[in-house]
C-alpha cells in the first residue's frame, strides 16, 4: 500500500492532482478541504494517501491531515459508501463539522451534501457514532461549541428529558453559546414544543 507521497505538485484540477515523485507522476484525488490548502504548483507537497485497488483501477486518495485520512477510512467501512461518496462528504464539510453532525445526530446537515439522502445520512450517523476519535474528543477543545452541546445535553438529561428531546432542543442553540445560556435556550425551546 502507498501510505504517503512527497514530491512536486505538477497539476491541480479539482479534485485531481498530479504529483511528481522522482520522475514518476502520481494522479491523486483529494477532498476540496485538502485542495484549498495545497501549495502552488511547482512547490513541494506531502500527502497522506489511501490506495484503493479495484479490478479495473488502482486509485490514490490524498489528505493533508491524519484526521482526514482516518475519517475517510471510517466512511469507507460503511455499507453503501464508496470512495467517491466519502470524498464528497469530506469535500462538503470539515472533519470537525462531520463530527459535530454525528454528535448532534443532525441528519438534515448531512442531506445537504450532494448524493446523500435521508437514509444514507441516518446510516452515516448510526455507524459513525463514537468512531471519529470519540467524535473528535467532542471537538477537541475545552470551550468548543460541541463541548457546550454535550454539557447542555447532560443537563437536560439530568432534568428528565429524553436524549431525543435534548438533541432536538440543542439544535436551537447557536454555536458558541455558553453552557448556562445554552441550557436556558434549550429549556425555552422544549417549553414551546
UniProtKB/Swiss-Prot annotation:
Segments for region (Flexible linker): 139-143
Entry-linked SMART domains: HhH1
Segments of this protein annotated with the region Domain III: 144-193
Region listing for Domain II, in residue ranges: 65-139
Keywords in alphabetical order: Cytoplasm, DNA damage, DNA recombination, DNA repair, DNA-binding
Predominant subcellular localization, coarse grouping: cytoplasm
Family listed: Belongs to the RuvA family.
Biological function: The RuvA-RuvB-RuvC complex processes Holliday junction (HJ) DNA during genetic recombination and DNA repair, while the RuvA-RuvB complex plays an important role in the rescue of blocked DNA replication forks via replication fork reversal (RFR). RuvA specifically binds to HJ cruciform DNA, conferring on it an open structure. The RuvB hexamer acts as an ATP-dependent pump, pulling dsDNA into and through the RuvAB complex. HJ branch migration allows RuvC to scan DNA until it finds its consensus sequence, where it cleaves and resolves the cruciform DNA.
Subunit structure: Homotetramer. Forms an RuvA(8)-RuvB(12)-Holliday junction (HJ) complex. HJ DNA is sandwiched between 2 RuvA tetramers; dsDNA enters through RuvA and exits via RuvB. An RuvB hexamer assembles on each DNA strand where it exits the tetramer. Each RuvB hexamer is contacted by two RuvA subunits (via domain III) on 2 adjacent RuvB subunits; this complex drives branch migration. In the full resolvosome a probable DNA-RuvA(4)-RuvB(12)-RuvC(2) complex forms which resolves the HJ.
Entry protein name: Holliday junction branch migration complex subunit RuvA
